[in-house]
UniProtKB/Swiss-Prot annotation:
Pfam families: Pyr_redox_2. PANTHER family: THIOREDOXIN REDUCTASE 1-RELATED-RELATED. Its EC number is 1.8.1.-. It comes from Leptosphaeria maculans. Keywords: Disulfide bond, FAD, Flavoprotein, NADP, Oxidoreductase, Redox-active center, Virulence. One of its GO terms (molecular function) is oxidoreductase activity. It is an enzyme of class 1 (oxidoreductase). This is Thioredoxin reductase sirT. GO terms for biological process: cellular response to toxic substance. Disulfide bonds join C139-C142.
Amino acid sequence: MATCPSIFDALVIGAGPAGLSAALALGRVMRTAAIFDTGVFRNAPANHMHTVPTWDHQSPVAYRQQCITELRQRYNGTIHFANTGVASVKAGKDSDYVVTDEAGKTWMGRKVILATGVKDVMPDVKGYAQAWGRYIFHCLFCHGFEQRGSESAGLLVLDKTILSTEIEIAVHFGHLALQFAKKITVFLDGHVEFLEDPRIKGLEAQGFLINPKPISKITYAADPEPGFATVHLEDGSEENMSFLVHRPRTLLAGDFANQLGLELTEAGDVKTTPPFYETSVKGVFAAGDCAVPLKQVVWAVSTGVSAGSGVNFQCLGADMAARSKLS
């Protein structure tokens, strides 16, 4: 491993597909980068990832490890790994940035790439978190194919803070779920006021089943596979579903957007400008789930490479300006 430079071209916060792809782009053009890896990933409950050519239905853990191995073997002269989280990030004195890791060590970089991902806000329903990623799916592009031919699927309307949005999602996911299951039930979790909502009545008219009863808990059969999830209702009744669909709200992982004063989108993601995904603060880029609404591995890879390219172009511009002053 080469000696760490006193100042890196980029400090990459996050070692998921976005951060690793950004590092790869930087390594290809001989830029130095430090990658901060907490080892915590949103898709940890999932055994497989999808829609990634040559890696479809394979382990996300194996994918990340292969990326890290490739970077270590081919680009160890410029790409450095720090197996620690980041405590803070701030602007330095000379148009650079300073990261303090969780061990108290400081790192300096010309640019920053946020690839921190997001955290899912789990609804306050007993058993939901345990079933998440196993029988409750937020994305049917990611998980639907493996459920094809199912007898039933349930759509959950749970988040009291965004109920109207949850109904819109249920309408969209309901029709999408029909591509994988024969019977669809919409669970309103006690929100009987939506029984008269034109969107719900429209689903009912099209053959969807509507269950307005409050949900007490969710359980699932771990064995044998394929099993089913059971929605337990407060009146004591139960409904078995081949799988459940719900997209919870997400929050940015870490306080770094706030520390840097970055603008956010209405959805709470970091606001960026294509094609290089620079944020509202010059020299700070964002990639992956924290920066795009479509939170999938392929998007993380794409935006990571774009952000890495953006860092190179800005560094190149500064290097050219410095050389011109010497001539």
